[in-house]
Amino acid sequence: MNDYIVVKCGGSMLEQLNDVFFDCIKKLQQQYKVVIVHGGGPEIDAKLKDCNINVEKRDGLRVTPKEVMDVVQMVLCGSTNKKFVMNLQKHNLLAVGCSGCDGKLLQVQPVSEEIGYVGEVSYVETALLKGLINMNYIPVIAPIGIHDNEIYNINADTAAAGIAAALSAKELILITDVDGILHEGKLVKKTDESEIATLIEKGVITGGMIPKVQAALASLKMGVQKISIVNGTKDFTEDTGECIGMTVTRGVSIV
């Protein structure tokens, strides 16, 4: 059990998770060392609305001045992270919640001044993750990072990809609420970066699946070797630890 697996669960999925999801995490933990990264977009947007703070997005990223960053930190590192940890432990999965600023876990480079406190992962302190795992805990990471003693928001997909690449993880698993992509009436089980562009052009990949495959492509560029996009509301893990869903790698032909 030397291989690492990183599981990314978006904020919109957190309220949909059922017993099946936690059973799958247990199966993964029997075969691999598991790290979980979560988002929190819907809860952040709701809290910003409650605070009467307007939200602007550019290229899919939330513009994050200081007042927005304070809310993002409060939600991700507070309620969202702790509720997820408690849910895992309710299902007998020992977990420790932390953010990327704890122990300088996730160090970032700012994306741009125009977008505010938004960063991209530049360094991962893997010793902290390995230490928690060696004590039989599942690290549950809120995607917040640090740069020059300031706290930055990180897109959860890229945070998960950065962690997976730093750990040389066997696989990054992206949790969704759909089974995958249908091509000519069949579920696509394997694809690669070049064929994803073809499938988008043909209209096979549409709607909400487009950002998911784009996240997979970005992960490949960061050095992750294998990304699985799975339906977290169903059994997505074999007893062997293999995922049931769509796998994105390099050089696999399906079209």
Curated annotation (Swiss-Prot):
Catalysed reaction, written as an equation:
N-acetyl-L-glutamate + ATP = N-acetyl-L-glutamyl 5-phosphate + ADP
Which cysteines form disulfides?
none
Please give one Pfam family short name.
AA_kinase
E.C. number: 2.7.2.8
The UniProt GO MF terms for this protein read: acetylglutamate kinase activity; ATP binding
Q: Where in the cell is it found?
A: Cytoplasm
The answer to keyword Cell inner membrane applying to this record is no
Report the CDD domains cross-referenced here. AAK_NAGK-like
User: Does the keyword section mention Nucleus?
Assistant: no
Q: What does this protein do?
A: Catalyzes the ATP-dependent phosphorylation of N-acetyl-L-glutamate.
Homology family: Belongs to the acetylglutamate kinase family. ArgB subfamily.
| Descriptive protein name | Acetylglutamate kinase
Species assigned in the record: Bacillus anthracis
Q: What is the lineage of its organism?
A: Bacteria, Bacillati, Bacillota, Bacilli, Bacillales
The encoding gene is argB
